[in-house]
Curated annotation (Swiss-Prot):
Its main location: nucleus. GO terms for cellular component: nucleus. Residues 139-168 are annotated as: Disordered. This is Protein TIFY 11b. The keyword Repeat does not apply. It holds the Pfam family tify. One of its GO terms (biological process) is regulation of defense response. Coiled coil: none annotated. Residues 68-103 form the Tify domain. Keywords: Jasmonic acid signaling pathway, Nucleus, Transcription, Transcription regulation, Ubl conjugation. InterPro entries: CCT_CS, TIFY/JAZ, Tify_dom. The lineage of its organism: Eukaryota, Viridiplantae, Streptophyta, Embryophyta, Tracheophyta.
Length: 187
């Protein structure tokens, strides 16, 4: 259910972004060609040092040559396992979208990591319970082949003691019973 909420939020965000882009393109077309801002490099790694001298030289050279329009190129957004592509997306708008995305990203990962860490022991416990439930028969068996337990062998010994231990005793008891049962006639 949580996955549905994320995908729905993503779809809504993409729809809003698409509407914004269309509105901006219509306004830009209606207002005419406005001078484009200089293209700047976005820092994707906030802690890294960036050498800006070469970029400044390029910008100065471009300003002297005259204002250049920002080329339109496709914009591809990967989010939540999905990919959204916008055709002919202006570079300045792409920079604005990147700025907006980076400002909103600061608080979101901290919340997700905290929730994930809180769920880990519960998930681990549930996983172990499933594992043990599937293998409880294996855990109960001490060896791969069943051996009679000592309690079972002791219980069967008294039955063996009741029977005669010698074959001679068996013959003697059989002959005594035969003598009793036989009919003797004396004349």
């Amino acid at each position: 259910m949580a996955m549905e909420g994320k995908s729905r939020r993503f779809a809504v965000a993409c729809g809003v972004l698409s509407q914004y882009v269309r509105a901006e393109q219509k306004m830009a077309a209606a207002a005419g060609a406005a001078p484009a801002r200089a293209v700047t490099t976005l820092s994707l790694m906030p802690g890294a040092e960036v050498v800006v001298e070469e970029e400044e030289r390029r910008e100065v050279g471009e300003e002297e040559a005259g204002p250049a329009t920002a080329p339109a190129a496709p914009l591809t957004i990967f989010y939540g396992g999905r990919m959204v592509v916008f055709e002919d997306f202006p570079a300045d708008k792409a920079a604005e979208v990147m700025r907006m995305a980076s400002s909103g990203m600061a608080a979101a990962p901290a919340q997700r990591e905290g929730a994930a860490l809180a769920d880990m022991p519960i998930m681990r416990k549930a996983s172990l319970q499933r594992f043990f439930a599937k293998r409880k028969d294996r855990l109960a068996a001490t060896t791969p082949y069943a051996r009679p337990s000592p309690a079972e062998t002791k219980a069967s010994e008294p039955e063996e003691k009741k029977t005669p231990t010698s074959w001679l005793d068996l013959a003697a008891s059989a002959s005594a019973a035969a003598r009793r049962d036989s009919l003797t006639i004396a004349l």
